[in-house]
Amino acid sequence: MENKNKIKVIIPFYNPGDFLDMCISSVLTQDYENYEVLFIDDCSTDNSYSKIPGCVYKHDENGQPIKDENGELIIIEKHPLLDRTKCLNVMAWKASSRATALPNIHNGIMNFATNPDDIVVILDGDDWLSGKGALSYINDFYNQNPECWMMYGSSKWTDGRRCCSSPYPEYEFKNLRAAPFRISHIRTFRAGLYHKIGEQDNMFSCMKDKEGNWYTMTYDVAMFLPMLEMAGFEHIKHNSKPLYIYNRDNPISDDKVNQQKQWDIHEEINNKSPFKKIESYK
């Protein structure tokens, strides 16, 4: 019998405008059934969270969901579910203050993807999946590659051109922090692999600056370098089929706003201590 992995799609966004419509539509029309979606609104000012079908849940200033005296999540708003979502579980968090993507994604994984076998898919709110079979393909990929703990790639620009994406050669795992960073959209991994970061760095300082603040951009490098190092070459797989549409038309994209800061943060991350390889993500 085919294994239907639980897939957790985490979608952080800030002022995505009408691009969020494409994102929502691409996620809610998937032909895969065993998946859940968490939208995280980083205090948008364009009222984009009102487009999200489902429930908006209350959480504190650290991004932790707040429960009532019965242990139930507190719903602050309800938006109508589209018929096409069927029994899909859609959740949303609305931040009370700007936090940026990295702490929002971190809190999403730690609170939403608690089973180590969950497959986490990161989808930015101004991007979208390339077709209705994207999640089915991801499920099949992990089933066909049981040794895989992380699968990444590939994507296209909105004009149809393929984005640059390449597999890691094995020799680069001798010093990943000196190698080119190759983790491109679509970014997926077993939740347990991310949880293991906390066993070697319980404060997740690998994702924070010298003052202890979460990095405000370059979240992909901060998140994925530790996971790459812990997993090792044999547990990382590159996918060549485009499953993701990467949208650079949003004028507030990080690489358009402050590219130099991105490079500076990347260099700071590379200078941190590497993580030790692990035997299992569970």
How should each PLM-predicted stretch be described?
Residues 2-281:
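Nucleotide-sugar donor-binding/catalytic module of glycosyltransferases
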